[in-house]
Every structure is written in structure tokens, then in C-alpha cells.
Design a protein with these regions (language model features):
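Flexible helical/loop "lid" subdomain adjacent to adenine-nucleotide binding pockets
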Residues: 109-261
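Enrichment for repetitive, rod-forming helical segments
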Residues: 100-103, 184, 214, 294
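Core alpha/beta nucleotide-donor-binding catalytic domains of modification enzymes
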Residues: 1-179
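AMP-forming adenylation/ATP pyrophosphatase catalytic core
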Residues: 2-29, 48-51, 80-82, 178, ...
Length: 295
């Protein structure tokens, strides 16, 4: 079995001949995604988002366009402008998502999955945050290690781009990648990446089972629920229901659940221990005549 066959056996691409959109930045991960998708026999269309955040960003787009031309792959360039300032990574990610099709495939690997788990742990995430990308059809390379993908790309005739910002330690993900994970591996005396990825998979199965147990709760709207009934629920069930009902948009970067502190304050409102509470996303949860109201 050659390298491409081995990586494809661990990937989760759709059936050959399927039309797919790929996010191709030109880096080794996305270039590996492109080459493997073609090896799989998919009908590929490549998308590249130019944020114009670096002086050379247009050169990157030109480089990807040349590669796509050589591979006879349709290339679509998206020009977006992201204003400098705080939370730039999140806003740039939101701009990418808005520019490309929702079903676009990305080159996230197992290493990206584990980095996301650790970042979410530091935010105090629950089940959802600790099981990212698992069974996500837009992340077909989530079971492939980054180094293996890069080795595959290095054997191709194409030169990948390297974003120098991936080495800058002022970005939290880079510190997790370059500092935290190596320390964890050293302390554990083993490679923790596949260990944490497996843990995420197991937790995902348990989360899916919990979803089945609470399926009837999904049909209960926030403002139609009777607080007297909700107050009798086990706390874990009530928290789970509130997390879904109180999720909010975060600067256009997808839907995010409320923090643990927000959920606890909402529980107090449900149980009549508080009249109202302020929540994220500029919302306020209040209780009147045994009914909840989100404004």
C-alpha cells in the first residue's frame, strides 16, 4: 500500500465521482486535501480566500491558482477584507465561512482536532467542545496525522506555502501546538494526540446517546416551557436543555453555547431564585408567570 492509499484508507471522503468544494489556502494541509481528493476520484472545485492581511496574500492566491491550473481543477478566488483589531482570528474565520459554500471540505487533521479540544478545555467547554470534528463530513482528514499528510505532499511535484503566522506565539493555538502538546507528550511519556482523539470519539458516542435520551426535550421551546415542570428536572438535563436554547452567534463565527456561568444563572431564573439575568450576545433571560422570555 503506497502513501496515498494508506491516507485514503484513513480518510472520510465521499464516493468517487462526487462533486465537492475544497478550501485551499496553499498550505501543506489544504494542498494534501486537494491531492487526496483528486486521488479519490472526486469532482473537485477549489476555493481560496484572500484576506489581504499580509502583503504577500495575493501572491498566495496566484500560487494556488497556478497549481489548480496544472491539475485542471476549477479555481474560485474570494476577496474579503477583515479590519485589524482584536479577535482577528475569529473574525477572519467568520469571513472565510461566509465567503465559501457551507459544505466546503477543509484540511483539518487529527492534530487540529486535538488542538481544538485543548483550546476548548481552557474555555471550560462541555461535551460539544470536547468532541469537535468527530464525524464531521467537512473534515475528511480528521483521522490523519499532520506529519503524515505533510510527508505525502513533500513527495508531490507541488510546493506548499507556509504561513509565517503559524509560528507566532501570540496566537493561542500556536502556543498549544508548539508548547502545550509537546509538554503533555513529555509528561505522559507517549504521543497524546491519538489518545485525546480517541477520547473525543468515545465522548461523541456518549453525547449521541444522551441526545437520544433527551430527544423529546428538543421539541420543547424556551417560551412554551413551564418553569414548574423544568424545576423538577435533574440539573444535568436542565443545563443541557438551556445550553441549546441559549446558544448565540459570536461575531458571525458560528453559533456558540452559553458559558457555564451563564447556564447556572439561567438555572436560577428557571427555579425562581432570580427574576432575570443578562446573557451573551446582548440577550436577557427573564421569568414571569412561570414562563421564560429571551430578549
Amino acid at each position: 500500500m503506497n502513501t496515498a492509499e494508506r491516507l485514503l484508507s484513513a480518510s472520510d471522503f465521499p464516493e468517487p465521482g462526487t462533486a465537492v468544494d475544497l478550501a485551499v489556502s496553499g498550505g501543506p494541509d489544504s494542498l494534501g486535501l486537494l491531492l487526496l481528493a483528486l486521488e479519490r476520484g472526486l469532482d473537485v472545485r477549489a476555493h481560496h480566500v484572500d484576506h489581504h492581511a499580509r502583503p504577500t496574500s495575493s501572491d498566495d492566491a496566484d500560487h494556488v491558482e497556478v497549481i489548480c491550473g496544472e491539475l485542471d481543477v476549477p479555481f474560485i478566488r474570494h476577496d474579503v477584507l477583515v479590519a485589524p483589531g482584536g479577535n482577528f482570528e475569529s473574525r477572519a474565520r467568520a469571513a472565510r465561512r461566509a465567503a465559501m459554500p457551507r459544505s466546503v471540505l477543509t484540511g483539518h487533521t487529527m492534530d487540529d482536532l486535538v488542538e481544538t479540544i485543548l483550546l476548548n478545555m481552557m474555555r471550560g467547554a462541555g461535551f460539544d467542545g470536547l468532541t469537535p470534528m468527530v464525524e464531521d463530513p467537512t473534515k475528511p482528514l480528521r483521522n490523519i496525522r499532520r506529519n503524515d499528510l505533510h510527508f505525502y505532499v513533500s513527495g508531490s511535484r507541488f510546493f506548499p506555502l507556509y504561513d509565517e503566522t503559524n509560528e507566532r506565539l501570540e496566537f493561542r493555538r500556536n502556543r498549544v501546538r508548539h508548547e502545550l502538546i509537546p509538554v503533555l507528550c513529555d509528561v505522559a511519556g507517549r504521543d497524546v494526540v491519538p489518545l485525546l482523539a480517541r477520547q473525543a470519539s468515545l465522548m461523541h458516542e456518549e453525547r449521541r446517546w444522551l441526545n437520544e435520551l433527551t430527544a423529546e426535550d428538543e421539541d420543547l421551546g424556551l417560551e412554551e416551557a413551564d418553569c414548574r415542570e423544568l424545576a423538577q428536572w435533574p440539573t444535568a438535563r436542565l443545563r443541557r436543555w438551556l445550553r441549546v436554547r441559549l446558544a448565540h452567534d459570536d461575531e458571525g463565527d458560528g453559533v456558540h453555547p452559553p458559558s457555564a456561568d451563564e447556564v447556572e444563572r439561567a438555572v436560577r431564573v428557571v427555579r425562581g431564585e432570580a427574576v432575570a439575568t443578562e446573557l451573551g450576545g446582548g440577550t436577557r433571560l427573564s421569568r414571569s408567570a412561570q414562563r421564560l422570555r429571551l430578549e
